[in-house]
Every structure is written in C-alpha cells, then in structure tokens.
Regions:
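N-terminal export/targeting leaders of redox proteins
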Residues: 1-34, 114-117
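Phosphate-binding glycine-rich loops and adjacent basic patches that engage nucleotide phosphates
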Residues: 2-8, 38-47, 64-72
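Short hydrophobic/aromatic-rich motifs at helix boundaries and adjacent loops
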Residues: 16-17, 48-52, 73-76
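Solvent-exposed, well-ordered amphipathic alpha-helical segments
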Residues: 23, 37, 83, 97-99
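Generic hydrophobic secondary-structure packing signal
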Residues: 26, 32, 78-81, 101
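Periplasmic/extracellular electron-transfer cofactor-ligation site
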Residues: 31-62, 80, 84-90, 110-117
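Electron-transfer interface patches adjacent to heme c in soluble/periplasmic c-type cytochromes
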Residues: 63-76, 91-102
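C-terminal capping alpha-helices of c-type cytochrome domains
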Residues: 93-117
Length: 117
C-alpha cells in the first residue's frame, strides 16, 4: 500500500509543479496585471496605443495576428524585444527594472490574446 501511495504522489506532485510553472510564465496575478499596465503606459503606450502602432508608417502593432506573423507571439520573444529593441524600436533594458520585462511581456501577450479590449 505504501508503494501505491508513493507511485501516486510523485506524479501528482510533478504535474502540480509543471502546471504552476507554466501558469506563472503565461498568466499574471492581479498585482502583476496592474504593474504590467503601468509599465506599458510608461514605456510602450506612446508608440503602441491599445496595441496598435502610431509612430511610423509600416511600424508593427502588438495585435496577436501581427505577433504571430512575425513569430514573436510568446513571452520570451517579447522580453528580448523589450530589452534589446527591434527595427526602429530601441530597447529598454536600461529603463526596465529586474523582472519588469517579464511582467510587461506577459501583460502584452495577455492583451494581444484578448484583442486589446
């Protein structure tokens, strides 16, 4: 009976850890949503109002279809772009504090998935 419990508990714990990790990487908690929105307003909104593009003709939007077309519809790609920039957009690694790039990227992906409602 002890072996059965052991064989049952280990996979359950493993699944919980995997689920928590993927959930944390993809979705934000309430405080992070506020932080993500604040960071976006301070750093990105001047160029990407509601996920659109208002700077230069031909600039890219943050709408999900545009992110997918460019192969950057994931948190890690957005983190890299937020830090290093892309095209005409400069990077903000000197402006973003530790962890803010991830919170911002998660917030952008969540809003892109919701259609920037």
């Amino acid at each position: 009976m002890k072996i059965f419990k052991f064989l049952f508990v280990i996979p359950v714990i493993t699944l919980v850890i995997i689920f928590q990790t993927s959930f944390q990487n993809r979705y934000l908690m309430a405080s992070d949503i506020r932080d993500g929105e604040t960071i976006f307003r301070n750093v990105c909104a001047g160029s990407h109002v509601r996920g659109g593009s208002v700077v230069l003709k031909g600039s890219k939007s943050l709408k999900l279809s545009d992110l997918e077309k460019r192969g950057i519809a994931d948190v890690n790609s957005i983190i890299i772009i937020a830090n290093d920039g892309i095209g005409f957009m400069k990077g903000y690694k000197n402006k973003l504090k530790d962890g803010e790039d991830k919170v911002l990227a998660q917030w952008i992906i969540q809003n892109a998935e919701k259609g920037w409602e």
